[in-house]
Structures are given as structure tokens and as C-alpha cells.
A protein has these predicted regions:
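GST-like domain detector, emphasizing the conserved glutathione-binding G-site
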Residues: 2-148, 217-221, 225-230
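Alpha-helical scaffold segments in carbohydrate-active enzymes
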Residues: 23, 100, 104, 137, ...
């Protein structure tokens, strides 16, 4: 089986800022899988990408350049299944529980997109209050340290690493205090920030790149950034 693995060629098609891409890269790094990565411009998608990605989104995983997988959750599950060990708990109920909270994390990502696209202060703060209440719910579910359920890093941790990373950048131009009074979320965020795979999921210029992206949104967030002189 291991011999067969070495023959497989993994090529991940990505975008530099996409959080769904990050969870796929974290999975590849955690499982020590050799892969190549190609960043594309989503505003100017190459023709070959449109053929490979029926939904027009990243990430896309090309396996041996002939089979194409899309949607990050499916890519992560596949990579986990075809390599030794697992980033999921072995207990089936526990695994399903992790998957449910992964889905919850995807909902937080949608709220974050709504946050940075909000046109005015009122809608921005309303959406932020919703995000804060979602983290308050998560606070009651984090059952271990340093990761979601303890010492072992799981797929759910790969999902929340990119979520927390947004707030590292938001903190540079806002005082949202998203995690005030949420000590478990704070510890978890800190542990994920220090995890090598989470760090390697983005380029070193990610914060500056994200700020530039946000600045161009014509939103309340872009006003905040300009006010800070960034």
C-alpha cells in the first residue's frame, strides 16, 4: 500500500488567500504527503481550470493529473484515507461529532465573508456579534488542550486554523476583541497559530496580501484599513 502511495502524484490547485485551500494544505503537511501547488487568479481563471473545476472554486486536487477532486472537505477526507494513520478520531460517534463541528466552522467562514463585505458600521457590528456568538457556542465544545479534543491534532483543527488566522489580520486594524471571555478559544487559537502545518498553509506575505484584498472591497472594512493608514 505504501509503495502504491509513492506512485501517486498530488497536484493542488489553489488561491493564495482561500481558507478552504489552507485546510487542504494543512492536511497534506500533517500527513507528510509530497505534493505540488499551483496558485491561480480567481478573477482571471485559466481555461484548463474551468475544465477541471466544475464549480469554479478552489481547491482542486489532481491525482496523477488525470482524476480531479473538488471541494475541500472531500479532498481532506480522501487524503486522510489514503495515507497511514488518521486525522479523525477512531470512534465513529466522535468522528461524526468532529464532522458536525467542521460544518459549523464552514458557517463561520461564510459569516467572515459577510463581515468583510459589510457596507456600513451597523451591519459590520451586527455580523461581528453573530460571529462572536458562534465562538461562544464553540467555547462550550472545546474539550482539551492544546487542540479541540486534546493533545492530538485532528482535521477539525485544520479547519479552525485558517478561521482564527483571519482575526490575526483583523486585529491589526480593529479592536473587535472577538475572543474576550472565551479562554478555551484563545488557547486553541494560540496553539493553532504555533502549529507548523498551519503556518505553512500560507505565504509569508499573507497578512499584507489579505489587507490589500480587504482594502479593495469598497466596504466598511476597507474604510477601517484606510483610517489606520495601512
Amino acid at each position: 500500500e505504501n509503495h502504491a502511495m509513492k506512485q501517486q502524484n498530488f497536484h493542488l490547485v489553489t488561491h493564495a488567500l482561500c481558507p478552504y485551500v489552507q485546510r487542504s494544505i494543512i492536511t497534506l503537511e500533517e500527513k507528510s504527503i509530497v505534493y505540488t501547488r499551483t496558485d491561480i487568479d480567481l478573477a482571471n481563471k485559466p481555461t484548463w481550470f474551468k475544465q477541471k473545476s466544475p464549480m469554479g472554486r478552489v481547491p482542486v486536487l489532481l491525482v496523477d493529473e488525470n482524476r480531479t477532486l473538488f471541494e475541500s472537505a472531500i479532498i481532506c477526507e480522501y487524503l486522510d484515507e489514503v495515507t497511514p494513520g488518521s486525522l479523525h478520531p477512531t470512534d465513529r460517534l466522535e468522528k461524526a461529532y468532529h464532522r458536525a463541528w467542521i460544518e459549523f466552522g464552514s458557517g463561520i467562514l461564510q459569516s467572515i465573508a459577510s463581515l468583510y463585505n459589510a457596507k456600513d458600521s451597523a451591519s459590520f457590528h451586527k455580523i461581528h456579534a453573530e460571529i462572536h456568538s458562534k465562538f461562544r457556542i464553540i467555547e462550550g465544545e472545546v474539550s482539551g488542550t492544546p487542540f479541540f479534543t486534546g493533545e492530538q491534532f485532528h482535521l477539525i483543527d485544520a479547519v479552525y486554523g485558517p478561521i482564527f488566522r483571519y482575526f490575526d489580520v483583523f486585529d491589526s486594524f480593529t479592536d473587535l476583541n472577538t475572543f474576550t471571555n472565551l479562554p478555551k478559544c484563545q488557547w486553541w487559537r494560540s496553539a493553532l497559530r504555533q502549529r507548523k502545518s498551519v503556518q505553512q498553509a500560507v505565504a509569508e506575505n499573507y497578512p499584507a496580501h489579505l489587507v490589500q484584498f480587504l482594502k479593495n472591497r469598497d466596504s466598511y472594512t476597507s474604510q477601517l484599513i484606510l483610517t489606520e493608514g495601512m
